[in-house]
């Protein structure tokens, strides 16, 4: 599966790479906002591509204090040892009750085991509320996404004819939006024809 960053992490940092973390400490520790990234390893980068450097992470996120991810646990431990910490917040979002625990959920459970005296709280509702209010740049981005979607749908209509496969119309839509500058679709394309058109989450796109 393609990696998809936690949407709240992307909202707060502008970064969409794996194995990163963001710590906001409302204590007297030296740094209150710390971004953690993977350390570049040349041998690994030959196989999987370049990793984000500290300078690049600073430039994208606007966060000055950027460190390597292998130091995140020790920093949290030091902060807790030095300060009186009453509560810790984790982004513990689940799509549904039956979902597998996210990485954040696993970290939260480990935190509870290590520090049972500290109240564990869910930061998800607070960040979700922040994301509901859009600034001018975000509104422009949404308007651009609407325009690109419209162009993609118009291409689907222009190429639609009897005998075409659903996945062919999916390809037409996704080709157009990418040619218009979109990196990807927001969710898997639903190209339901006939009775498949009434399925809210149809996704096989294998029929004519």
Where are the language model's segments positioned?
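Short, basic/aromatic beta-hairpin or loop at an interaction surface
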Residues: 184-197
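Beta-strand scaffold of nucleotide-dependent catalytic cores
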Residues: 35, 189, 202
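Acidic/histidine-enriched ion/cofactor-binding microenvironments in catalytic or ligand-binding pockets
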Residues: 13-16, 110, 197-208
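Flexible loop/turn segments at secondary-structure boundaries
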Residues: 43, 96-98, 176, 197-200
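A composition/biophysics-driven feature that prefers long, compositionally simple stretches
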Residues: 1-151
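Short, small-residue-enriched loops and turns at beta-alpha junctions
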Residues: 128-130, 160, 197-199
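Active-site pocket-lining segments that scaffold enzyme catalytic pockets across diverse folds
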Residues: 136-187
């Amino acid at each position: 599966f393609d990696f998809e960053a936690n949407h709240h992490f992307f909202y707060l940092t502008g970064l969409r790479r794996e194995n990163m973390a963001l710590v906001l400490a409302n204590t007297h520790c030296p740094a209150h906002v710390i971004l953690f990234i993977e350390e570049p390893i040349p041998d690994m980068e030959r196989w999987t591509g370049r990793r984000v450097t500290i300078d690049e992470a600073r430039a994208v996120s606007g966060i000055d204090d950027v460190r390597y991810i292998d130091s995140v646990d020790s920093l949290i431990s030091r902060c807790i040892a030095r300060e009186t910490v009453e509560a810790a917040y984790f982004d513990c979002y689940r799509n549904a009750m039956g979902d597998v625990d996210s990485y954040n959920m696993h970290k939260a459970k480990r935190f509870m085991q290590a520090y049972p005296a500290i109240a564990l709280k869910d930061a998800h509702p607070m960040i979700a509320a922040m994301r509901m209010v859009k600034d001018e740049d975000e509104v422009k981005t949404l308007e651009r996404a609407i325009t690109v979607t419209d162009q993609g749908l118009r291409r689907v209509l222009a190429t639609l004819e009897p005998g075409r496969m659903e996945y062919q119309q999916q390809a037409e839509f996704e080709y157009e939006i990418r040619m218009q500058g979109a990196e990807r679709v927001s969710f898997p394309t639903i190209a339901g024809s006939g009775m498949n058109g009434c399925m809210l989450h149809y996704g096989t796109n294998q029929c004519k």
